[in-house]
Amino acid sequence: MQTPRLYRVILPVADIERATAFYGVVFGTPGQRISPGRHYFNCGGIIFACYDPEADGDGEQGGWRLHPLQYLYFAVPDLEDTLARVQTAGGIIVADIDTMPWGERLFYARDPFGSPVCFVDERTLFTG
């Protein structure tokens, strides 16, 4: 059996316009508006979807809560440039660039909605 391929990750957001602006600056691409409350960014063949249920007419879905350590990890070619983009776009740096014991160079941040995100130097990815 072939291993399933991850193709989309959905991040609930409270304001689709702010999310689009933030991730557009951080990723350096405008992405694509799919519906009033969905905006997609192609991240190396995997869709990163910002989803605002209110803007999409879905209302309160209830029950889902973000765990503070539930990070989304993005591999990037230039860690320092990405850190600057996150700051410029209004993100909060939680932990500055550091090297983990397993060799990854990365930094932790929060987007404007408090969602935890991590950016890893693509040359140092540890995949097990």
Positions of predicted regions on the chain:
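Vicinal oxygen chelate
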Residues: M1-Y7, G28-A75, D81-R110, D121-G128
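Conserved active-site tyrosine of GNAT-family acetyltransferases
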Residues: A19-G24, V86, G114
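Short glycine-/small-residue motifs
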Residues: P116-F119
